[in-house]
Amino acid sequence: MEKFKAAMLLGSVGDALGYRNVCKENSTVGMKIQEELQRSGGLDHLVLSPGEWPVSDNTIMHIATAEALTTDYWCLDDLYREMVRCYVEIVEKLPERRPDPATIEGCAQLKPNNYLLAWHTPFNEKGSGFGAATKAMCIGLRYWKPERLETLIEVSVECGRMTHNHPTGFLGSLCTALFVSFAAQGKPLVQWGRDMLRAVPLAEEYCKKTIRHTAEYQEHWFYFEAKWQFYLEERKISKDSENKAIFPDNYDAEEREKTYRKWSSEGRGGRRGHDAPMIAYDALLAAGNSWTELCHRAMFHGGESAATGTIAGCLFGLLYGLDLVPKGLHQDLEDKEKLEDLGAALYCLSTEEK
């Protein structure tokens, strides 16, 4: 249970650290960000108070997803209606938090008063952003057991496409939910990427079964898989026999910036549903159990660092708990108690069958 609470909490810590960085228009290069951090005394001396270190829309939407998952729903359609209600309720809080534009657009298309079609939104050519990935980690906490894979796939796809009805967007939510479930199962980190890709065809089958936007999906489906396959080959972990990620000899902040931009589809690392989880995963592979190293790689770079920080922080919490993280980063965090309560509730529900 403690690690589930840590996952919810550190996802928000990663968000706050990365969001402060995104808000600083001049801090566009990882090296500068890290130098500034050192001048202020480093991570050990930071205290994340809500006024100085607010969270972004990533945490607000993640809390909304977790709140829906912890209600007493009878069937998945009821869960989706509850998600719609939660998202519509909090959407007015989002504009001041610099949200993923697709999140706002998607929430505007939700229909809480339409019982049958509440969560059915139109296909969105611009719905490929990170926002689906950063609100879905808790789905992996709720359905982490291997025998719940089918439910995890269905819920993460539906949750994702409520706001990001584009394969690059909603496959991001599948990816983060799966990664969290793998962490909860104790699956070796190096296997996560290839096991996630094995689940993508199951998501495609589910989408075909629901007969929504099949033609549009087919046109864009390949991109997410291709980007991830290239990444796994680059790190030499695409095959089952490969169990050690290989990093370049020189992979400092400047080199990472170039690499993150290369993985991106628009030159801003972590902006989309494929590369926000990718940067977080890459950071976890490199950092091991070092929270400081994880922050340098996932929370302090010139891209969409709030998104990558949210995902990386959540996964770190589930893998390693809170003990390796300075207390100042979470003792006064915005919505701390709510996050911990949701983590505890998700743990309890995930051990019961539903």
Curated annotation (Swiss-Prot):
InterPro entries reported for this sequence: ADP-ribosylarg_hydro, ADP-ribosylglycohydrolase, Ribosyl_crysJ1, Ribosyl_crysJ1_sf
The protein's GO terms of the molecular function aspect are:
ADP-ribosylarginine hydrolase activity; magnesium ion binding
- Main location (coarse class): cytoplasm
GO BP, sorted A to Z = cardiac chamber ballooning; cardiac myofibril assembly; protein de-ADP-ribosylation
Keyword set, alphabetical order: Cytoplasm, Phosphoprotein
Q: Which family does it belong to?
A: Belongs to the ADP-ribosylglycohydrolase family.
Origin organism of this chain? Pongo abelii
Recorded protein name is: Inactive ADP-ribosyltransferase ARH2
What is the role of the protein in this entry? Required for myofibril assembly and outgrowth of the cardiac chambers in the developing heart. Appears to be catalytically inactive, showing no activity against O-acetyl-ADP-ribose.
